[in-house]
From Swiss-Prot:
Signal peptide: none annotated. Pathway: tRNA modification. It catalyses: cytidine(32) in tRNA + S-sulfanyl-L-cysteinyl-[cysteine desulfurase] + AH2 + ATP = 2-thiocytidine(32) in tRNA + L-cysteinyl-[cysteine desulfurase] + A + AMP + diphosphate + H(+). Its EC number is 2.8.1.-. Its cofactor is Mg(2+); [4Fe-4S] cluster. It comes from Pseudoalteromonas translucida (strain TAC 125). It is an enzyme of class 2 (transferase). This is tRNA-cytidine(32) 2-sulfurtransferase. Binds 1 [4Fe-4S] cluster per subunit. The cluster is chelated by three Cys residues, the fourth Fe has a free coordination site that may bind a sulfur atom transferred from the persulfide of IscS. It comes from the Bacteria. Belongs to the TtcA family. The gene is ttcA.
Length: 304
C-alpha cells in the first residue's frame, strides 16, 4: 500500500470512528443512559457489535464529564468448539475488569428444541436470566447490550408482520421485575459502519453459529427486505428510524395511547388535521443520520 493509500485509509478510519463515537454519545445523552456513579455491565459476546460497543464506552468513560465504571461479562454457554481463550486474552490486554460466566445452556436448549429448529428464542431467554442474575451479584446499575439501529428497525417490522404490534427494541428498557435497567448505546449506529469498524480494528470475532442452530428465517427475510429498500431507495432506512422517534398517537388507532372516545370538538390535535387533505409526503426521505462533515469533532456531552 502506497503512502497516499495509507493516509486515505487512516483518514477514513478516523472519520468512521468519530461518527460512531458521536452517535454513541448522542444516544447516551438523548436517553439518559449513563449517570454519575453508574456501574455498567458490558455484555461481550465476541461479535462485532459488542466489541465496538465496549470500544465506544471506554472512549466515553475517558471524555465524559461524569464518573462511571465499566466491567465486562461474557457468558460461556458451553457450545461445542467455543474458543474459551479468545476473550480472556483480549480483555487482559485491555486491562479491564471482567468475568466469564460458565453456564451450560447449550445442553438445556438441545434437550428441549428438536434438531434443525432454531434455538435462538429459548437460548435468548436463558441468557437474559443469567445476565440479570450476574448483574445483581456484581452490583451493576445498568446492563449494556450491543444492539444497533438496524436491529431496532428489523424488530419493528418483525413485530408488525408477525406479532401485530407497533413495537420495536427500545434504546433503554426496564426489566419486567423492575430491578434492571438495560441500555443500548449503539442505538443510533448503522450495522454497516460497525462491521467496517470491527474489520479494520481486527477484533477476534467469535462466530455466532457455534450452536448449529438454524438462523431465524423471519429476521433473515426482514433484513433482506430492508437491504433491498436501502439499495433501491437511498434514505428510506434513515427515514424509518426517524419515524420511530416522531410518533403521533392521535393519527394511529390505539385507544390506549390516545383517547378517541372522549375526543371533543374545539380541541387542537397534535399532528394536524389531514382528514380531508392528502398527506404531505416529502419527495426526498428524511435522513437525520447523514454523515456529517469529515472535519467535525466529537460532540462534547453533558451527562449530568
Amino acid at each position: 500500500m502506497s503512502h497516499s493509500d495509507q493516509a486515505k485509509a487512516q483518514f477514513n478510519l478516523t472519520k468512521l470512528q468519530k461518527r460512531l463515537r458521536r452517535q454513541t454519545g448522542q444516544a447516551v445523552m438523548d436517553f439518559n443512559m449513563i449517570e454519575e456513579g453508574d456501574r455498567i455491565m458490558v455484555c461481550l459476546s465476541g461479535g462485532k457489535d459488542s466489541y465496538t460497543m465496549l470500544d465506544m464506552l471506554q472512549h466515553l468513560k475517558r471524555v465524559a464529564p461524569i464518573k462511571f465504571e465499566l466491567f465486562v461479562v461474557n457468558l460461556d454457554q458451553k457450545q461445542p468448539g467455543f474458543p474459551e481463550h479468545v476473550l480472556p486474552q483480549y480483555l487482559d490486554k485491555l486491562n479491564v475488569e471482567y468475568k466469564i460466566v460458565e453456564e451450560d445452556t447449550y445442553s438445556i436448549v438441545t434437550d428441549i428444541i428438536p434438531e434443525g429448529k432454531t434455538t435462538c428464542s429459548l437460548c435468548s431467554r436463558l441468557r437474559r436470566g443469567i445476565l440479570y442474575r450476574t448483574a445483581k451479584e456484581l452490583g451493576a446499575t445498568k446492563i449494556a447490550l450491543g444492539h444497533h439501529r438496524d436491529d431496532m428497525i428489523e424488530t419493528l417490522f418483525l413485530n408488525m408482520f408477525y406479532g401485530g404490534k407497533l413495537k420495536s427494541m427500545p434504546a433503554k428498557l426496564m426489566s419486567d421485575n423492575g430491578e434492571h435497567m438495560v441500555i443500548r448505546p449503539l442505538a443510533y449506529c448503522k450495522e454497516s459502519d460497525i462491521s467496517q469498524y470491527a474489520f479494520v480494528q481486527g477484533y477476534p470475532i467469535i462466530p455466532c453459529n457455534l450452536c448449529g442452530s438454524q438462523e431465524n428465517l423471519q429476521r433473515k427475510h426482514t433484513k433482506a427486505m430492508l437491504a433491498k429498500w436501502d439499495a433501491e431507495h437511498p434514505g428510506r432506512i434513515e427515514s424509518i428510524f426517524t419515524a420511530m422517534q416522531n410518533v403521533v398517537p392521535s393519527h394511529l388507532a390505539d385507544n390506549q395511547l390516545f383517547d378517541f372516545t372522549n375526543l371533543q370538538t374545539g380541541e387542537v390535535i397534535d399532528g394536524g388535521d389531514i382528514a380531508l387533505d392528502k398527506p404531505d409526503i416529502p419527495k426526498v426521505p428524511i435522513n437525520s443520520l447523514q454523515d456529517e462533515d469529515a472535519s467535525a469533532e466529537v460532540v462534547t456531552i453533558n451527562l449530568s
